[in-house]
Amino acid sequence: MVGKAVTTPAVLREVLLKYLAHHPDASDTLDGIRGWWLPDMQPPPSAEALHATLEALEAEGKLIHTVMVDGSVLYARAR
């Protein structure tokens, strides 16, 4: 029996950084990132795994986040 593929934090990080390299002005919410930045990732990352990876990239200075008036959070490449 073939095991189910696992989206590791390292793979998720690599995919996000590649997306931002090709779309340097991109910004989106966690749900938007899951739907638009990672549409072909199978299995799709959990919201928790994606949030942890986004926080790690922010801690590394690769991403920033902005809290909008409605409370939603946008993530974007750090400049």
Model-found features: residue ranges?
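Short alpha-helical segments that sit at the start of domains
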Residues: 1-27
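Short acidic, hydrophobic short linear motifs in intrinsically disordered regions
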Residues: 26-38
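Short helix-coil junctions and helix-kink-helix linkers
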Residues: 35-47
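Basic amphipathic alpha-helical segments that dock to polyanions
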Residues: 50-60
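A short, conserved structural fragment
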Residues: 58-68
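Short, cationic-aromatic polyanion-contact patches
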Residues: 67-79
